[in-house]
Protein backbone atom coordinates (compact mmCIF):
# COMPACT_ATOMS: atom_id res chain seq x y z
CA UNK A 1 0.00 0.00 0.00
CA UNK A 2 1.35 3.41 -0.97
CA UNK A 3 2.37 5.76 1.81
CA UNK A 4 1.02 9.29 1.97
CA UNK A 5 3.81 11.63 0.98
CA UNK A 6 4.12 15.03 2.56
CA UNK A 7 4.45 17.88 0.11
CA UNK A 8 8.12 18.66 -0.39
CA UNK A 9 9.28 21.88 1.23
CA UNK A 10 10.33 24.49 -1.26
CA UNK A 11 14.02 25.27 -0.87
CA UNK A 12 14.47 28.76 0.50
CA UNK A 13 17.08 30.77 -1.35
CA UNK A 14 19.38 32.09 1.35
CA UNK A 15 21.51 35.12 0.66
CA UNK A 16 24.92 34.27 2.07
CA UNK A 17 27.98 36.15 0.82
CA UNK A 18 30.80 34.07 2.32
CA UNK A 19 31.11 30.34 2.87
CA UNK A 20 33.46 27.47 3.64
CA UNK A 21 34.13 24.69 1.13
CA UNK A 22 34.99 21.40 2.81
CA UNK A 23 36.71 19.11 0.26
CA UNK A 24 36.98 15.57 1.62
CA UNK A 25 39.09 13.50 -0.76
CA UNK A 26 39.61 9.86 0.15
CA UNK A 27 41.19 7.11 -1.95
CA UNK A 28 37.70 5.99 -3.04
CA UNK A 29 35.57 9.13 -3.38
CA UNK A 30 35.58 12.92 -3.20
CA UNK A 31 32.91 14.83 -1.28
CA UNK A 32 32.42 18.59 -1.39
CA UNK A 33 30.31 20.43 1.20
CA UNK A 34 29.81 24.17 1.04
CA UNK A 35 28.61 25.65 4.32
CA UNK A 36 28.21 29.09 5.80
CA UNK A 37 30.80 30.40 8.26
CA UNK A 38 28.91 28.86 11.21
CA UNK A 39 29.01 25.40 9.57
CA UNK A 40 25.39 25.10 8.39
CA UNK A 41 25.27 23.21 5.08
CA UNK A 42 24.29 25.18 1.98
CA UNK A 43 25.17 22.78 -0.84
CA UNK A 44 26.93 19.46 -1.21
CA UNK A 45 27.91 16.97 -3.87
CA UNK A 46 30.15 13.96 -4.33
CA UNK A 47 31.63 11.94 -7.14
CA UNK A 48 29.10 9.19 -6.40
CA UNK A 49 26.09 11.50 -6.69
CA UNK A 50 27.40 12.70 -10.05
CA UNK A 51 26.89 9.19 -11.40
CA UNK A 52 30.42 7.81 -11.16
CA UNK A 53 30.70 4.25 -9.87
CA UNK A 54 33.52 2.13 -8.55
CA UNK A 55 37.08 3.20 -9.23
CA UNK A 56 35.93 6.13 -11.43
CA UNK A 57 34.77 7.94 -8.28
CA UNK A 58 38.37 8.43 -7.18
CA UNK A 59 39.47 10.24 -10.36
CA UNK A 60 40.31 13.96 -10.51
CA UNK A 61 37.67 14.43 -13.23
CA UNK A 62 34.93 13.09 -10.95
CA UNK A 63 36.09 15.47 -8.21
CA UNK A 64 35.98 18.36 -10.69
CA UNK A 65 32.40 17.52 -11.71
CA UNK A 66 31.30 17.24 -8.06
CA UNK A 67 32.91 20.58 -7.19
CA UNK A 68 31.21 22.28 -10.14
CA UNK A 69 27.83 20.86 -9.06
CA UNK A 70 28.21 21.96 -5.43
CA UNK A 71 29.56 25.34 -6.53
CA UNK A 72 26.62 26.08 -8.82
CA UNK A 73 24.18 25.18 -6.04
CA UNK A 74 26.04 27.50 -3.67
CA UNK A 75 26.04 30.33 -6.21
CA UNK A 76 22.24 30.07 -6.33
CA UNK A 77 22.29 30.93 -2.61
CA UNK A 78 24.48 33.97 -3.23
CA UNK A 79 27.87 32.66 -2.09
CA UNK A 80 30.72 34.66 -3.65
CA UNK A 81 33.78 34.15 -1.43
CA UNK A 82 35.04 30.84 -0.09
CA UNK A 83 37.51 29.56 2.44
CA UNK A 84 38.61 26.08 1.36
CA UNK A 85 39.38 23.27 3.82
CA UNK A 86 40.96 20.25 2.13
CA UNK A 87 41.04 16.93 3.94
CA UNK A 88 42.36 13.52 2.94
CA UNK A 89 44.99 11.94 0.69
CA UNK A 90 42.93 11.48 -2.48
CA UNK A 91 43.69 12.53 -6.04
CA UNK A 92 40.72 14.90 -6.31
CA UNK A 93 42.01 17.63 -4.00
CA UNK A 94 43.61 19.99 -6.51
CA UNK A 95 41.09 19.44 -9.30
CA UNK A 96 38.16 20.22 -6.99
CA UNK A 97 39.93 23.38 -5.87
CA UNK A 98 40.61 24.44 -9.46
CA UNK A 99 36.98 23.78 -10.42
CA UNK A 100 35.74 26.03 -7.60
CA UNK A 101 38.15 28.78 -8.66
CA UNK A 102 37.05 28.45 -12.30
CA UNK A 103 33.41 29.03 -11.30
CA UNK A 104 34.35 32.55 -10.23
CA UNK A 105 34.53 32.16 -6.46
CA UNK A 106 36.96 34.45 -4.68
CA UNK A 107 39.04 32.02 -2.60
CA UNK A 108 40.27 33.78 0.54
CA UNK A 109 42.22 30.93 2.15
CA UNK A 110 43.18 27.29 1.61
CA UNK A 111 43.76 25.08 4.64
CA UNK A 112 44.82 21.44 4.83
CA UNK A 113 42.92 19.91 7.76
CA UNK A 114 43.98 16.29 7.19
CA UNK A 115 44.19 14.60 10.60
CA UNK A 116 47.71 13.39 11.35
CA UNK A 117 48.31 10.79 14.03
CA UNK A 118 51.09 11.54 16.50
CA UNK A 119 51.90 7.83 16.81
CA UNK A 120 48.34 6.83 17.65
CA UNK A 121 46.66 3.64 16.47
CA UNK A 122 48.62 0.89 14.73
CA UNK A 123 48.11 1.18 10.96
CA UNK A 124 46.68 -1.72 8.93
CA UNK A 125 49.08 -4.29 7.51
CA UNK A 126 50.70 -3.69 4.10
CA UNK A 127 48.81 -5.02 1.10
CA UNK A 128 50.41 -7.84 -0.87
CA UNK A 129 49.11 -7.80 -4.42
From Swiss-Prot:
Domain of life: Bacteria
Gene3D superfamilies linked: Ribosomal protein S11
GO-annotated cellular components: ribonucleoprotein complex; ribosome
InterPro entries: Ribosomal_uS11, Ribosomal_uS11_bac-type, Ribosomal_uS11_CS, Ribosomal_uS11_sf
UniProt xrefs under SUPFAM superfamilies: Translational machinery components (SSF53137)
Record-level GO BP terms: translation
Pfam families: Ribosomal_S11 (PF00411)
Protein name: Small ribosomal subunit protein uS11
Subunit structure: Part of the 30S ribosomal subunit. Interacts with proteins S7 and S18. Binds to IF-3.
Entry keywords, A to Z: Ribonucleoprotein, Ribosomal protein, RNA-binding, rRNA-binding
Keyword rRNA-binding: yes
Statement: the UniProt record of this protein carries the keyword Kinase: no
GO molecular function, one term: rRNA binding
Similarity comment text for this entry: Belongs to the universal ribosomal protein uS11 family.
Role played: Located on the platform of the 30S subunit, it bridges several disparate RNA helices of the 16S rRNA. Forms part of the Shine-Dalgarno cleft in the 70S ribosome.
